[in-house]
Amino acid sequence: MKIAIIGHGNVGGALAKNWAKSGHNIIIGTRKAQDEKAAQLVAEHELIKTAPIQEVVATADTVLVATPPQVATALARSWGTLPGKVIIDATNAIWQQPEGYDTAYHAFADITKAEVVKAFNTTGFENMENPQYGDTTADMFIAGDSETAKEMARKLANEAGFERVYDFGGGDKVKALEHFAFAWINLAIMQGEGRNMAFKVLKK
């Protein structure tokens, strides 16, 4: 599968490396020819390449967005309509929001008409690199109205090492999933528990 990564910071970079190890072709969208972070990722794995953002979005099967949320509306408008393409929104509009929307998910869904899912936003990038904790793994959580996009997110989460993926619900639950992400940020960073922590659902 060809996966476009838009936003190759900590989260995007971690998932790019993880999915490349699973055999996917990763194309990192860049705005400039000389991009040190992108070049470092390319050097780490032969299945990671770079190309201009518009090109990678047009040619990829799935697009992961891990940018600051406030640029989502402009990105979506620049891409136009993308019927049938899967977009995974890994942003969190907690302190800043996209122009005209509460979340990046809603901007992408409304403007591009793509198959959109919220995922990979509720834990730190360290867990994107390795979600293993002893003999168990961190859980992943998804939300959105597209079953096609959810199925893709489940598949990619499993391949990244997340054994269990829980469905938070439809597009009306996306903001709740961002609040859930803030719970991780609060515990890990603000309350000093450390970034090597994750959420796990326990059942009796």
Residue ranges: model-predicted function:
Residues 6, 140-204:
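Active-site-lining helix/loop region of Rossmann-like oxidoreductase modules
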Residues 96-97, 106, 130-151, 155:
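Short beta-strand and adjoining strand-loop segment in the mid-core
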Residues 91-134:
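Rossmann-fold NAD(P)-binding glycine/threonine-rich loop
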Residues 1-40:
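NAD(P)+-binding Rossmann beta1-loop-alpha1 motif at the extreme N-terminus of oxidoreductases
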Residues 43-46, 82-83, 111-112, 160-161:
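Short, structured coil segments at secondary-structure junctions
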